[in-house]
Structure formats: C-alpha cells, structure tokens
UniProtKB/Swiss-Prot annotation:
Lineage, opening ranks: Bacteria, Pseudomonadati, Pseudomonadota, Gammaproteobacteria, Alteromonadales
Gene expressing this chain: pcm
Homology family: Belongs to the methyltransferase superfamily. L-isoaspartyl/D-aspartyl protein methyltransferase family.
Protein location: Cytoplasm
CDD domains given in the database record: AdoMet_MTases
Protein name: Protein-L-isoaspartate O-methyltransferase
Alphabetized InterPro entries for the sequence: PCMT, SAM-dependent_MTases_sf
Length: 211
C-alpha cells in the first residue's frame, strides 16, 4: 500500500467515524485497505470518496459507509465463520477477511469472482473460500454460519440463507425492490427475530442466473 493510498484510506476511516461508525476494528480495516485496488484505473481517483461506484457487469462497489455499517452490525455478534453473498469487486470481502477467522464468499458473475480472488491474494488474505454460484441458495455444505452478509437487495428473504444460520447467528440483508431496508435477522432455535436498521439502495439479488 503506497503512502498516498494509506493516507487516503486513513482519512476515509476518519470520515466514516464522523458519520457514526464506532467499531475500532472496522475503522482499522478500512484504513488498511487500498480501495483503488478494487476499481478500474479510470475511477481510482474516486476510490476514497464515500460513494458507490460502478465495477462493470451492472454491479457496483458499495459506499464505504454501508460496507462499514454492515460489517459493524455483523461483528456485534462476534462471528467465527461468515458467508458473504455477492463478492462483487472483493472490497467487502477484504474488510471481512481481516476481521473474522473464516470467510466464504459467493459470486454469480465469473469475471468478477476471478478478479476478486486475485485482489485478495495480492493483499495476502488467505482465510477466504470462493464459490461461483447462485448466492440465493447460500453454501449448504459449508453451513452453518455464525453470520451471513448479503450485498444485494432481495425482494424477499431467501429461506435457504435463514436455514444456514447457526444458533444465535445473524443475517444482514437489504430487503425490498424500489424501497429497500437494511435488516438484521437473528436465529433462536427455529425462530427468527428481525430488526430494521436503515433505508439503503443496492443492486438486486438475482435468483438462479449465472453469468
């Protein structure tokens, strides 16, 4: 990580702290992650702005505040094994991989998955398992998970993801179509409590179609 990138990442973490992010480990991970690595060169100058940016294939790299907020919500439950649905650029995975012992991540667009794998390897993050597949179905043979994070909006909550939560596990997911709410579901035996966190805007979670 260059000195310029490090300074920019540290400044981004400070902005997120001012915006309400409080978890010190999340802020540290943001400050140590070169966001420009996850963007095309043409957009690298915007890497440390607190905004979502296109990454091709109709997908985006999420706004840093949302990345940090979802991570903070997940870490409140001290997960040991986490599933990310929607690898995308790999930026969210890079943040999570610094904070949890084991990360599994699924992407339905092959080209994005290949790029993300290469980027995390460059960052020497080796506690990540990648899967090319339909995130709507989760990763049954690697379940149960202490935490599941979905980085695209589902019109309804996928039952498969709820079923793959461990006891006490949490699912962080944007739900809705035009109007979306970031929600947290917590498993207690065969029951699930839900909590609305805030209004968000994500690309849709596609069911079944691989690209």
């Amino acid at each position: 990580m260059t000195r310029v990138a490090l300074t920019s990442a540290v400044n981004l973490a400070k902005k997120l702290q001012e915006a309400g992010i409080r978890h010190p480990a999340v802020l540290k991970a943001i400050s140590h992650t070169p966001r420009e690595l996850f963007l095309d060169n043409a957009l690298a100058h915007k890497a440390y702005e607190n905004t979502a940016l296109p990454i091709g294939q109709g997908q985006t790299i999420s706004q840093p505040y949302i990345v940090a907020r979802m991570t903070e919500l997940l870490l409140q439950h001290q997960p040991q094994k986490v599933l990310e649905v929607g690898t995308g650029s790999g930026y969210q995975a890079a943040i999570l991989a610094q904070l949890v012992p084991e990360l599994c991540t699924i992407e339905r667009i092959k080209g994005l998955q290949i790029q993300a794998r290469q980027r995390l390897k460059r960052l020497d993050l080796h506690n990540v398992s990648f899967k090319y597949g339909d995130g709507w179905q989760g990763w049954p043979n690697r379940s149960p998970f202490d935490g599941i994070m979905v980085t695209a909006a589902a019109a309804k909550v996928p039952e498969a993801l709820l079923s793959q939560l461990a006891e006490g596990g949490v699912l962080i997911i944007p739900v809705g179509e035009e109007t979306q709410q970031l929600m947290r579901f917590t498993r207690r035996s065969d029951r699930f409590s839900s909590e609305v966190i805030e209004t968000v805007k994500f690309v849709p979670l596609v069911n079944g179609e691989l690209a």
